[in-house]
Amino acid sequence: MFVQANSLEEIKRYFNSELSNLYTESEIKLIIKELTIKRLNISPLEFILVSRERLSESDLLFYYDALKRLRNQEPFQYILGEVWFYDLNLKIDSRALIPRPETEELVDWIKTDLKNHSQPTIMDLCSGSGCIALALKSLMLESNCSAAEYSEDALSLLRENTKRTNLSLDISKMDVLNEDDYSYLAPNSFDCWVSNPPYIPTREKSLMAPNVLKYEPLMALFVADEDPLIFYRVIAEKALVYLKKEGVLYFEINENLTVSMLTLLEGLGFVNIEVRKDLQGKDRMMKAQTVSSHHES
């Protein structure tokens, strides 16, 4: 790694020259800031003060390794090994999808809706890193939160994050498409279900960023072209059995499938269906409520 001096200023210069074809200047600035805060174990305020301080050889090796990985378009959250989600510092690596800001918006919605609910029972299906369930638990400590995930890799990360945040979740391995995997749940026992399931049709793979395809777990992203609503349909059908009357179901959705989702949920008998856009103006979240009677399982 060629730097003229062992200082952060030089690291910034070098990163900009090496990565400008892959990242914007502001992205590079953010990456360096996050890497430095983690490496030197300093606060964001202290970061402003260290730009001319001398770095050790091991520090330089750390930045060089990060640069190599960034050149290969590995997400910098995986390089850091952690991500902030709703004031929680979560461990993150290629075992699970990187939590996105849009998902924080979904948590916001649920938090607002449940604020007057005492001890709500919540289930997060296809939980991944556990970001939704853990954020909701941190916001409503009196809640009973469950998290279900099928991937063994994601489950191990979910357990690590539960321990890391000192929060309690009921965690289970569950294939949401398998009828038998719901048998341990009690009917009419949940106030809220939430899921951010795989929702990108395989045909859209070519539209995805290369770093997502190369590093993030594809089983958490893609569904078969012939049935892109499969996860939503099965989860919604089961929600009718396991949600309490007037229980609420929340989904993160594919903006191209809004109309199909509305048709699906209305057809199943859900009421008070609402769609919300994310900060980019795309349909991203959906909410539906059960009526005062339930289907039989």
Per-range role (PLM):
Residues 12, 32-33, 63, 76, ...:
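A general structural signal for well-ordered alpha-helical segments in protein cores
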Residues 143, 148-290:
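S-adenosylmethionine
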Residues 49-51, 64-141, 145-160, 287:
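SAM-dependent Rossmann-like transferase core, predominantly class I methyltransferases
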Residues 2-80:
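N-terminal auxiliary segments of SAM/dcSAM-dependent transferases
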Residues 292-297:
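Flexible, glycine-/basic-rich loop-and-beta segments that form/coincide
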Residues 5, 9, 22, 56-60, ...:
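Short, solvent-exposed loop/helix junctions and linker helices
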Residues 56-61, 112-121, 142, 178-188, ...:
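Short, glycine- and charge-enriched coil/turn segments that flank and shape catalytic ligand pockets
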Residues 14, 34, 62-65, 105, ...:
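Alpha-helical elements of Rossmann-like donor-binding domains used by nucleotide-donor carbohydrate transfer enzymes
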